[in-house]
Every structure is written in C-alpha cells, then in structure tokens.
Amino acid sequence: MKALAKLKKEPGIWMIDDAPMPEYGYNDVLIKIKKTAICGTDLHIYNWDKWSQATIPVPMITGHEFAGEVVAKGNGVTSVDVGDRVSGEGHLVCGQCRNCRAGKRHLCRKTIGIGVNVQGAFAEYLVMPAVNVFKIPDSISDDIASTFDPMGNAIHTALSFNLTGEDVLITGAGPIGLMAVKIARFCGARRIVITDINKYRLQMARDFGATVAVNVSEFQNQQQLTAQMRKVMSEIGMTEGFDVGLEMSGINSAISMMLDVMNHGGKLSLLGISAGDISVDWGAILFKGLTLKGIYGREMFETWYLMTSMLQAGMDMEPIITHRLHIDDYQKGFEIMKSGQCGKVILDWSR
C-alpha cells in the first residue's frame, strides 16, 4: 500500500508504494484512510529534531490525524460496522493501570501514540483497536473529522474551566490556539485576547472572534510584553485580570506574562510543550491563588462527545482548514505548514 514514512534518520518524509498491509486482530478495526491532516508533531518528525531523534523508531509510518471508512473488523468487534465513517483516538492506553480502570484513560502512564511509537495514519490503511475508533456523525465532513485530534486538544484545554462570561487569554495562535478562540466564543466568553508572532494567524484569530490579537514580536522582553498587555486590558475595559488562561505556546515569556496578568483566583490550562526548562514566578501562583492544570491529549471519550455535540450545535470550524491537497502533493503540504501561513492542511487519500 501507499504510505508516508520516516525511512532515514535525517530531515524528510518519504512516499513508499510497497508498505505492508496492516493485519487486524480479534478486537481491531481496519480503516481505509480518506483524509489526513498534518500536525505540528509531524513537522518535528519531518525536521528530525532532538525530540524526534530520541522518540521515533525508523522506519515508521507517521501521521495520527485522520478520517476514513471501516472496511474490515475482528470477530470481537460490535461497536462499529463495515462502511461506517470513522476517526479515532490516537493515544493507545494499557487498560490495566489505576487510571485506565477508573475511566481516566487520558492519564494512562503507558500511553503510546500512533504515528509516533507505532505505525500511523499516513497510509492507505490503518489498524486500530475498536475501543479507540470513533464514528463520525453524518453532519460532519471527513475534512473536519480529520482534525478531531487537535480540535479535541483545544476542547480539553478550553473546557477544563468555565468560559461563560469570563475574560480569556490565549497564548499561542497555532491551529489549536485558533480553535480555542472559536470554542471560547461559542461558549460565551466575554473578552478573548490572543498573542503570537505570526501575523497571518493573528488575523485568523480576529476573524474567528478574538477581541484583540496581539503581535508579541514587537517586544524585547517579558516586562515589555506585560506592560503592553496591561495597556490592551485597559483599552478593552478590563479593570482586574484574566479569569482563564489557555497556554498553547510553551514559551517562557508567554507563560510569565500570563501569570502576571491573571486575576486572583484565575485558572490556567497548560497545553504548550516547552523545548527546555521553564522559569516562573512561584509567588504569583501562590499569592494569586491560581489553579493550574496540565493537559495531555483528549479525555476519552468525553472530549469527543463534547466536540461533536458543539459542531452539531453550530460551532463552525471549517475556516480552520486553509489548504486541501492530494496526497501526492504532500511535500507542498509540509512546506505550507512549515511556513506558518496556514491553518490546517488536509491531505486527500481518496482521489
């Protein structure tokens, strides 16, 4: 079968035509891939950075954001049928640890990821445990369903705390941060401020409903950034601080600024992964009585339920998809993603 694979321990991802068909077992589902989306993780693997070098076995079929159709299933599978449109949870868990047995599978200590630790979705076919497969409602397109993984990250991050009537600060306007703007606006946030250095994505954030989108590339240090944020807060009528912070960047200065401008009793969801150690003002956390929650992946499957329910209720995520390409043009897709001048890039395997 055709697949995109990491074949060498160097930058790049390569198309192959002779990847072996995956074999499915008693509790597995065989999925014919229709659409995939390129994730930031895929860029790390493409670029072969330090994280990838330490994590990714080679050779490896990459990719974990997908939509497809069930074409076969094991004899023990009753939850889906051949012909069902599906996406799937890319985190595979042990099912036996304390958290898994308590229904908190997103906290499994032994989590592994498709396209990272085991063969992934950038292929014509994917095998996945039936328990990880999620049926796509008829009203949701394959394109949108292929972005369920990052959208689920945004849902999990944003809905960890109440947003209705709250002032929300989002640091990082990548695709997940942009989705968080949509979610916060849909949930009735009062003011939404987002920060980034990417002018293209900051304009997308404004189009998505952000009250203010701040270009932080203009500021030399965290003190200047905090001063500018306080000016923005004053201009939009904020007399205290932000009630909820959604940290999507993993950047030290962004996190420090967020702590500075949070209201007392504020709540922070932290999704962004840092390339190194982070230094923060511990006193600000203590004396402001802040609540911090680390986010990894999606709650299985409450996040998926909330996500599809909100889409069916009218939350419009279509604008997050800015480019659609045939799989044969995957190199162009990766170049577009690397440029940052995009939202989500979809690769079509069905034509």
From Swiss-Prot:
GO terms for molecular function: L-threonine 3-dehydrogenase activity; zinc ion binding. The keyword Oxidoreductase applies. Catalyzes the NAD(+)-dependent oxidation of L-threonine to 2-amino-3-ketobutyrate. One of its GO terms (cellular component) is cytoplasm. It is found in: Cytoplasm. PANTHER family: L-THREONINE 3-DEHYDROGENASE (PTHR43401:SF2). It comes from Francisella philomiragia subsp. philomiragia (strain ATCC 25017 / CCUG 19701 / FSC 153 / O#319-036). This is L-threonine 3-dehydrogenase. Signal peptide: none annotated. Pathway: Amino-acid degradation; L-threonine degradation via oxydo-reductase pathway; glycine from L-threonine: step 1/2. Zn(2+) 1 binds at C39, H64, E65. It holds the Pfam family ADH_zinc_N. Its EC number is 1.1.1.103. SUPFAM superfamilies: GroES-like, NAD(P)-binding Rossmann-fold domains. Keywords: Cytoplasm, Metal-binding, NAD, Oxidoreductase, Zinc. NAD(+) binds at I176, D196, R201, L271, G272, I273, I295, Y296. Disulfide bonds: none annotated.
